[in-house]
């Protein structure tokens, strides 16, 4: 395989994990970070102890504080940053890009102020002439397990399947299997909204409820995700795949999940401010719950689990009371029609 340079914007766990994969595949990953300490640690010690403790990075993984240096000559630019920084970083990237490039994003969330998916934010901020294609790389994955080279599957979603195949070729190896898909909307809706349901799964576990409750929450949560997704143009079949039910399962059932951990603390009685301070990392489901609350109301989409989680987060709703209200809702048939 011909060696390619790939820029990765973001020196967090996911950006660093993907850089490791690219180095394993004999490519040249360059991580752009904004903290001297982390950039220096990656370059000098070949570790990123804050985000991926105990992982030794290949020496081919490089990091820089210079955006221009990171993207110079890169075939692909991977955007691996929290959703609340997406616009700011994309404005910088738009200024820095000198030629059309394949853009990949791995950020899972909805912008609360606009209800825009991350690909829509990127398209607003980066000139079309500077984008060869925009690919969403998503699926059931924890960066920690990718960095440990445990078997993982992802999906590269793009309207241009040839561009998705380029991304597939750069990342696929014996540890990371990549599929392709043309449903960008579905991939982004599934990836963003599962974080809300994962908060709920953590709350359920924190309250001491068992597997029955969590299975019901996940199943009915996926019905809500699909309902909204189809309303905004997704293929319902996408939600049965890696970026839908796959991502939901891994995020709702693992202690690696920031959203599950945050929900678990909420279920045990801590308030949101305390939880976010203890986490010390972005919990995307909190921001997404705020966005989807208004979005679902605007579209008149029935999302009772999502609304209950919003109430716990932002209206000081008692978690047990929220569960009681969900269980006491008017009886209905399970069958969904889209």
Swiss-Prot record:
InterPro entries: 6-PGluconate_DH-like_C_sf, 6PGD_dom2, G3P_DH_NAD-dep, G3P_DH_NAD-dep_C, G3P_DH_NAD-dep_N, NAD(P)-bd_dom_sf
GO molecular function: glycerol-3-phosphate dehydrogenase [NAD(P)+] activity; NAD binding
Subcellular location: Cytoplasm
UniProt KW keywords: Cytoplasm, Lipid biosynthesis, Lipid metabolism, NAD, NADP, Nucleotide-binding, Oxidoreductase, Phospholipid biosynthesis, Phospholipid metabolism
Main location per the UniProt record: cytoplasm
Family per record: Belongs to the NAD-dependent glycerol-3-phosphate dehydrogenase family.
Name of the protein this chain belongs to: Glycerol-3-phosphate dehydrogenase [NAD(P)+]
Natural source organism: Listeria welshimeri serovar 6b (strain ATCC 35897 / DSM 20650 / CCUG 15529 / CIP 8149 / NCTC 11857 / SLCC 5334 / V8)
Taxonomic placement: Bacteria, Bacillati, Bacillota, Bacilli, Bacillales
Gene: gpsA
